[in-house]
């Protein structure tokens, strides 16, 4: 009986200590091309679970260690975090190159712990735009 109680106590401790601030539903980027010749960029999107993220204030996207402003929108049980980056305009990021591994994430403030944290993804998925055919020259 003591062993069972000890096991349950340890399991409970680990479940609280390993609780994540963010549960990602989806994270991806798409290419976009503007109406003006040679204007292009990327849209970045991260969808996170609303319930586990209720104490968070999303501050920035981190892309190749540079900070970019975000739009945050609640939709049902999720929170959408978006950013549109224009090549050559926004901090002169080189968007023709792929996003480096482990270099995409978000910076957020946790109101419960009063700490700013960074959450990084190992890989960011590319998703072609459905309403726009992409042409590469």
Language model feature labels by segment:
Residues 18-137:
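Non-catalytic macromolecular-recognition regions in eukaryotic signaling proteins
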Residues 1-23:
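Bacterial Sec-dependent N-terminal signal peptides
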